[in-house]
Amino acid sequence: GLVATIRMKSNRLEDLHFSRQNPLVLVVESPEKPGNIGALLRTACAANLDALIITDLRTSIYNANCIRASLGGFFAIPIAVCSNEESLAFLRQHRFQVFTALIDERSASYDKQDYRGKTAIVLGTEAYGLSDHWRQNDFQPVQLPMPGQVIDSLNLSVSGGILMYEAVRQRK
């Protein structure tokens, strides 16, 4: 067998530093399933995002399923774990434009937005979507079209992947 010890990396919001002028970050509120977190990390790493911010975490990011599902993304992308309030203060302080994945009367199609600036994309919980903390702000809500007649939602990591890659496509 193989035994190793590693130093745990910092997961503090204040330790996030961006090398690009217009960073792209993904914010995930209260994720519960380690596999979804890992899949989001994998996609965020593949898309070359600048960070993943997890608010009000409901499981451990060090869960084996999270690390396994990330396929190494866990070790390659900066991760911050904080409260909703801390995340919101950070995004405002650093002047991010914020897009929330949300279906309501103000929601616009995700592909009609401009993600080329300093951008944060915010996803809600697997079961309930975004809390009032994110809904009650003046952020731009975006939605994915779902013309199918049976399914009205997508898996968290699938929705996140679509939104991340639209932002990446626009930045080329």
Regions picked out by a protein language model, each given a short descriptive name:
Residues L2, L24-L26, K118-G124:
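Generic beta-sheet signal
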Residues A4-I6, T43-A47, I61-G73, R135-K172:
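Structured adenosyl-cofactor binding patch, chiefly the S-adenosyl-L-methionine
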Residues N11-R106:
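RNA substrate-binding interface of SAM-dependent RNA methyltransferases
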Residues M8, S30, T125:
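Residues immediately flanking
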Residues G1-N11:
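Short, structured interface segments
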Residues L40, L130, L163:
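Conserved sugar-transfer catalytic core signal across GT-A, GT-B, and GT-C glycosyltransferases
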Residues F99-I151:
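Active-site/ligand-binding-proximal alpha/beta "capping" segment
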